[in-house]
Amino acid sequence: MGDIEKGKKIFVQKCSQCHTVEKGGKHKTGPNLHGLFGRKTGQAEGFSYTDANKNKGITWGEDTLMEYLENPKKYIPGTKMIFAGIKKKAERADLIAYLKQATAK
C-alpha cells in the first residue's frame, strides 16, 4: 500500500486541475472521483464520457488503477483524458492509496 500523504501531493500536482474527490464535488474537465473504487468505467453520474470509457467495462480498483494510471490512452484507447500517466510504480501506489481514502469519505 502506498503513502497517503505523498499520494495527496501527487493528486494536487497532477490530477486536481481536472478532478475532484469529495462527495458532491462537481465535475471539471474530468469526472468527480467520489465512489471510484468498485465503480465501472464511464459511470459517474452527470459526466459526459467517451464511448471508449463507457464500453471498457472494467471495475475500478487498485489493480485496474495501477495499470490505467501508467498510461491512460493505452489502457482505454479513445479516452479524452489527456494525462500522459505516471511511470513510477511507487508514485502510482501512493496516488491510489490517497484516492482509496479520499473518494470513500
Swiss-Prot record:
- Superkingdom to which the source organism belongs: Eukaryota
Quote the protein name from its UniProt record: Cytochrome c
Family membership, please give it. Belongs to the cytochrome c family.
* Entry-linked InterPro entries: Cyt_c-like_dom, Cyt_c-like_dom_sf, Cyt_c_1A/1B
List locations, semicolon-separated.
Answer: Mitochondrion intermembrane space
| Entry PTM | Binds 1 heme c group covalently per subunit.
N-acetylglycine-modified residues are G2
Keyword Mitochondrion assigned: yes
A single GO CC term for this protein reads:
mitochondrial intermembrane space
Its biological function? Electron carrier protein. The oxidized form of the cytochrome c heme group can accept an electron from the heme group of the cytochrome c1 subunit of cytochrome reductase. Cytochrome c then transfers this electron to the cytochrome oxidase complex, the final protein carrier in the mitochondrial electron-transport chain.
